[in-house]
From Swiss-Prot:
UniProt keywords, alphabetically: Chloroplast, Plastid, Ribonucleoprotein, Ribosomal protein, RNA-binding, rRNA-binding
PANTHER family reported in the protein's UniProt record: 50S RIBOSOMAL PROTEIN L31, CHLOROPLASTIC, LARGE RIBOSOMAL SUBUNIT PROTEIN BL31C
Function: Binds the 23S rRNA.
Domain of life: Eukaryota
PROSITE patterns: RIBOSOMAL_L31
Record's protein name: Large ribosomal subunit protein bL31c
Gene Ontology cellular component list: chloroplast; ribonucleoprotein complex; ribosome
Subunit record text: Part of the 50S ribosomal subunit.
Location within or outside the cell: Plastid, Chloroplast
Coiled coil: none
Lineage of the organism: Eukaryota, Cryptophyceae, Pyrenomonadales, Geminigeraceae, Guillardia
Protein family membership: Belongs to the bacterial ribosomal protein bL31 family. Type A subfamily.
Listed GO MF terms: rRNA binding; structural constituent of ribosome
Gene3D superfamilies attached to this UniProt entry: Ribosomal protein L31
Amino acid sequence: MPKQNLHPKWYAEAKVYCDGQLIMTIGSTKSELNVDIWSGNHPFYTGSQKMLDTEGRVERFMRKYGLKENNS
């Protein structure tokens, strides 16, 4: 006898949001998904170069190893 209620609930129309804006609908085990980056705003696909440093990782690395940024 197989176990009952083993598989998660499947949402065929799960909504994907990026910055509060509806991006697409997909099938998922969650009814809503929130993403930070998707192909519409990723630099590889858009051709733009921008640096996402949400936690100050670059500055922390520079301080840790005593490096200074030279803008010249």
